[in-house]
From Swiss-Prot:
SUPFAM superfamilies per the UniProt record, alphabetical: GroEL apical domain-like (SSF52029), GroEL equatorial domain-like (SSF48592), GroEL-intermediate domain like (SSF54849)
Gene: groEL1
Name of protein: Chaperonin GroEL 1
Keywords linked to the UniProt accession: ATP-binding, Chaperone, Cytoplasm, Isomerase, Nucleotide-binding
Predominant cellular place of this UniProt entry's protein: cytoplasm
Family the UniProt entry places it in: Belongs to the chaperonin (HSP60) family.
PANTHER family hit by this protein: 60 KDA HEAT SHOCK PROTEIN, MITOCHONDRIAL (PTHR45633)
Listed InterPro entries: Chaperonin_Cpn60_CS, Cpn60/GroEL, Cpn60/GroEL/TCP-1, GroEL-like_apical_dom_sf, GROEL-like_equatorial_sf, TCP-1-like_intermed_sf
First-tier enzyme category under EC: isomerase
GO terms of molecular function: ATP binding; ATP-dependent protein folding chaperone; isomerase activity; unfolded protein binding
Assembly: Forms a cylinder of 14 subunits composed of two heptameric rings stacked back-to-back. Interacts with the co-chaperonin GroES.
């Protein structure tokens, strides 16, 4: 396939055209006074969104050279979203500002590689300054403020604060669509896993089709149980204490299942058999979690234990076990608190070291089941487009809140970026072009506040000058401009706060992508082929 090439200034200008097209569409959504963007879908109603990364992901340009610039900028937005879950519009605005100023000085003869080195050194200093100014999340009010800022909706902010308070910072919160028009919340207490009862005959509540056992003894094994002889010794010991007996195993079938069902129908034993959750190594880990939560032992041949060797001491205990045909919940396991805490710390350590997003998600779920709980936020709306837009905002706000709990918060409204600018004065560089890179960063860091003000119909330069003057007069670095009220004041006190993780990720990713664009000297793409005109079908235009 033949290629076409652009070099030097022509190449960089083509990239900039692509960057500008994406950034100009995305930055209209910045801030509480930002506008929505409607995205056409080939089928169904258009998507109306206030989310920067959703807008960026939809953009594909016809010109292949411009499209390269667009895709690079999308990478800055997407990476920020992946790491912090929010801040995509800020990253896009910063990257565009750096590219715009950088291309001017490169065209004037500056060395692009030295410029990039200055940008990279500056970014390191900025990230350190942003982290140093962090304030930990103190209470529910801080969480509500972070979520409200992200979603531009106080109802969503209060909802997320309430749910997070209930399940704890290690809890799992998922967002689903609801059939109604309002928000709904669902909580799951205890440990729930997605395996239900093996036989419908085990149901204790016919109306709700649930099997509910109080204070049961729980046998946990990774084996398949087919013969009743394997569990008869432990069954006889359990019956001396209680009738309530739960089996969590790879499977229970054949004679073993038939005997349990018959004896349940006779009233001899109230048995519940459930398949073990997960597969492979994950199943072993989850069974171990259940064992620690309930104070039992996993009976496994891997550790030299057979089912007929199980004793009462090997069985777990819980206040209640409830099973439906789809899932099982263990409420108030009687496990040792110290052992549960040790297991939680072990899972946290695994989360910190894993590189796989899938593994991290599964570990987070296990952690939530042991440590906190599971909550579902159901989003409702009158129409389909509004529902999707609302769900996006709830997901963004949730990500921003988690990021805030993790690394702390800084003043929002673009103030944290302006406050970080003096950190660039301490960066030592050897070459003049590196200093130019630092100068570009100084100008770019003001851009988010300029755009926030512009979206609110104000003059960005005047707002920035007033913010700096008031900060100096009052000796308060948290002072900024509230675009909703049109008033100056402490951003922290007004609840206008951003997570540190979001702010630093936006800076890092914007500098990374802008540096790549500024140091590009050639672009290569395929020459589009002219498609031959379609030939008319056989017998076209003839009468028969």
């Amino acid at each position: 396939m033949p290629k076409q090439l652009y070099f030097n200034e022509e190449a960089r200008r083509a990239l900039k055209r692509g960057v500008d097209l994406v950034a100009d569409a995305v930055k209209t959504t910045l801030g509480p006074r930002g506008r929505n963007v409607a995205i056409d879908k080939k089928f169904g109603s258009p998507t109306v969104t206030h989310d920067g990364v959703t807008v960026a992901k939809e953009i594909e340009l016809k010109d292949p050279f411009e499209n390269m610039g667009a895709q690079l900028l999308k990478e800055a937005a997407t990476k920020t979203n992946d790491v912090a879950g929010d801040g995509t519009t800020t990253a896009t605005v910063l990257a565009q500002a750096i590219v715009t100023e950088g291309l001017k000085v490169v065209a004037a003869g500056a060395n692009a590689m030295l410029l990039k080195r200055g940008l990279d050194r500056g970014a390191e200093a900025l990230v350190a300054a942003i982290k140093a100014s962090a304030v930990p999340v103190r209470d529910r009010a801080d969480i509500a403020h972070v979520a409200t800022n992200s979603a531009a909706d106080s109802e969503i902010g209060e909802l997320i604060a309430e749910v997070m308070e209930k399940v704890g910072k290690d809890g799992v919160i998922t967002v689903e669509e609801s059939k109604g028009v309002t928000f709904e919340k669902e909580y799951t207490e205890g440990m729930q896993f997605d395996r239900g009862y093996i036989s419908g005959y085990m149901v204790t509540n016919v109306e709700r089709q649930e099997a509910e056992l109080d204070e049961p003894y729980i046998l946990i094994t990774d084996k398949k149980i087919s013969s009743i002889q394997e569990i008869l010794p432990v069954l006889e010991k359990v019956l001396q204490v209680t009738k309530n007996f739960v089996i969590i195993a790879e499977d229970v079938d054949g004679e073993a299942l038939a005997t349990l069902v018959v004896n349940k129908l006779r009233g001899t034993i109230n048995a519940l058999a459930v398949k073990a959750p997960g597969f492979g190594d994950r199943r072993k880990a989850m069974l171990q979690d259940i064992a620690i939560l309930t104070g039992g032992t996993v009976i496994s041949e891997e550790i030299g234990r057979k089912l007929d060797s199980a004793t009462i001491e090997d069985l777990g205990r819980a206040r209640k076990v409830i099973a439906t045909k789809d899932d099982t919940t263990i409420i108030e396991g009687r496990g040792d608190e110290a052992a549960i805490r040790a297991r939680i710390e072990q899972i946290r350590a695994q989360i910190a070291t894993t590189t796989s997003d899938f593994d991290r998600e599964k570990l987070q779920e296990r952690l939530a089941k042991l440590a906190g709980g599971v909550a579902v936020i159901k989003v409702g709306a009158a129409t389909e487009p509004e529902l999707k837009e609302k769900k996006h905002r709830v997901e963004d706000a949730l990500s921003a809140t988690r990021a805030a709990v993790e690394e702390g918060i800084v003043p929002g409204g673009g103030v944290a970026l302006i406050n970080a600018i003096p950190a660039l004065d301490n960066v030592q560089v050897a070459h003049e072009d590196e200093k130019v890179g630092l100068q570009i960063l100084r100008r770019a860091l003001e851009e988010p506040l300029r755009i926030l003000a512009r979206n609110a119909g104000e003059d960005g330069s005047v707002i920035i000058a007033n913010v700096r003057r008031l900060q100096e007069e009052k000796g308060d670095k948290t002072i900024g401009y509230n675009v909703l009220t049109g008033q100056y004041g402490s951003m922290i006190e007004q609840g206008i706060i951003d997570p540190v993780k979001v702010t630093r990720s936006a800076v890092q990713n914007a500098v990374s992508i802008a540096g790549m664009i500024l140091t590009t000297e050639a672009l290569i793409t395929d020459i589009p082929e002219d498609k031959p005109a379609a030939t008319p079908g056989a017998g076209g235009g003839m009468d028969f």
